[in-house]
């Protein structure tokens, strides 16, 4: 995958995360600055998601630790857990919010 394809695919993931947060009506603020998306919760905890262009990866940092995602079979997959990026984002958001979130 070249640089342009990588950015296009990551942009889609970031957009999906934003839309899911909006549709869930959860109290999660998000901001995208450059290559970094910051999710902030009512308790001021944060999840940081950023693109690592040189390695063609998406990295996620939360209170559970740091995770690296590579595109495997058209799915962003964690190198540690095998979990899909979107599923981990949802799981980590619920941990940070300390409540179940109604994901649509």
From Swiss-Prot:
Q: What keywords were assigned to this record? A: Iron, Metal-binding
CDD domains in the record, alphabetically? Answer: Frataxin (cd00503)
Which biological process terms from the Gene Ontology are attached to this UniProt entry? iron-sulfur cluster assembly
What InterPro entries does the database record attribute to this sequence?
CyaY, Frataxin/CyaY, Frataxin/CyaY_sf, Frataxin_CS
The cellular component terms of Gene Ontology attached to this UniProt record, alphabetical and capped at eight, are: cytosol
UniProt GO molecular function: ferric iron binding; ferrous iron binding
Q: Which SMART domains match?
A: Frataxin_Cyay
Q: Name one Pfam family in it.
A: Frataxin_Cyay
TM ranges are none
Top-level division of the source organism's lineage: Bacteria
Similarity-based family: Belongs to the frataxin family.
Q: What is this protein's function per UniProt?
A: Involved in iron-sulfur (Fe-S) cluster assembly. May act as a regulator of Fe-S biogenesis.
* UniProt protein name: Iron-sulfur cluster assembly protein CyaY
Organism whose genome encodes this protein: Vibrio atlanticus (strain LGP32) (Vibrio splendidus (strain Mel32))
Q: Provide the taxonomic classification.
A: Bacteria, Pseudomonadati, Pseudomonadota, Gammaproteobacteria, Vibrionales
């Amino acid at each position: 995958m070249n640089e342009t394809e990588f950015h296009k695919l990551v942009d889609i993931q970031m957009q999906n995360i934003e839309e899911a947060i909006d549709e869930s009506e959860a109290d999660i603020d998000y901001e995208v600055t450059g290559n970094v998306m910051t999710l902030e919760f009512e308790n001021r905890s944060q999840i940081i998601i950023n693109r690592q262009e040189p390695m063609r990866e998406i990295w996620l940092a939360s209170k559970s630790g740091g995770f690296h995602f590579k595109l495997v079979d058209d799915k962003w997959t964690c190198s540690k857990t095998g979990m899909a990026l979107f599923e981990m984002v949802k799981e980590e958001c619920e941990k940070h919010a300390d409540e179940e979130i109604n994901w649509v």
